[in-house]
From Swiss-Prot:
A Pfam family the protein falls into: Cyt-b5
Organism for this UniProt entry: Drosophila virilis (Fruit fly)
Encoding gene (name): Cyt-b5-r
Domain (Cytochrome b5 heme-binding) ranges: 16-100
Protein name in the entry: Cytochrome b5-related protein
UniProt function note: May play a role in muscle cell metabolism.
PROSITE patterns named among the record's database cross-references: CYTOCHROME_B5_1 (PS00191), CYTOCHROME_B5_2 (PS50255)
Upper taxonomic lineage: Eukaryota, Metazoa, Ecdysozoa, Arthropoda, Hexapoda
Positions that bind heme: 59, 82
Amino acid sequence: MVIETWKKSGIATKFPTYRNSAPVTVHSWQKGKRQDVEAEGLWRIKDGIYDFTEFIDKHPGGTFWIRETKGTDITEAFEAHHLTTAPEKMIAKYKVRDAYQRIYTLTLHEDGFYKTLKERVREKLKTIDKRPKRKSDVSDDL
């Protein structure tokens, strides 16, 4: 990608650090992301900086992902992987401070498309018959 054309994506307010370095690797991408989001070596979700250090070993999804994302903005991943509102309430105790404005232009307003869709999915899941899953789980255990 050429720096002059990066704004066409409209996702970020600045060109990603190390993105023009060849080759772009997972490690260079993560390094650039850590530098760009200014999470100060902690985790950023929306407009907050969080210290999940004490939570790493308790994370229900395992320790790998949460360790690897330290120092980055995990907003979109946090939203996509947590359908219930419980995790959002739980992270409040880990908040260190408010953060500067995000470099990403994606929004997750409470009355916006994504949050509305997420709420509708949450409601729909309450009505889904879970018997086929239970039957499948039992047969897997045999």
